[in-house]
Amino acid sequence: MKSVSKNLNSNISQQLFYLLVLVLFLRVDLVFENNTPTGGDMGAHIVAIDTFIKDFMPNLQINGWSNDWFGGYPLYYFYFPLPAIITFIFNLVFPFGIAFKIMVVMSTILVVYSIEKLMRKTSNQISIYGATAGLFYVFTESFTIYGGNLASTLAGQFSFAYSLAFANLSIFYLIKSKNNFR
């Protein structure tokens, strides 16, 4: 019984350590300032998500027509709507700028979590190697064009970070289901 509680305490302390590292490097104090994030393509994504929240969600639409650019274009017909939905949910509690930044930071945290989950040996023990690999991946600055790391996510490629995280989680659950039905 003592070994179970010792492992649980160790697991919780490891998770808290990696969460603390993320919180310290992601500057959560800046996330909760009510301003509009900028950098890279971020400004263009703000317009699209703002249109989604103000025009589409009151009508319970996921996609529709936007008159913002090019004399109008179909918005969210060919683009990933989950970040806009997440921003809408947080916008019910927080102002738009804070809700948008929470959605962006969540994508980075989800990437680290998905890499850690993919490298776990058991489902209840945190993988130190996985969490470390996730942090190294997120903090790498050498491949900003590919997305998924912090530099590209803050430049507006947060949709790619979500897709990368969901791909890792899909692989994890496929492996887990294969092992369960063996």
What are these regions (language model features)?
Residues 11-16, 125-130, 181-182:
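Membrane-interfacial loop-to-transmembrane alpha-helix junctions, especially the N-terminal start
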Residues 25-168:
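Active-site lumenal/periplasmic loops and adjacent helix-entry segments of GT-C-fold
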Residues 2-6, 120-121, 176-181:
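Positively charged n-region of N-terminal signal peptides that target proteins for export
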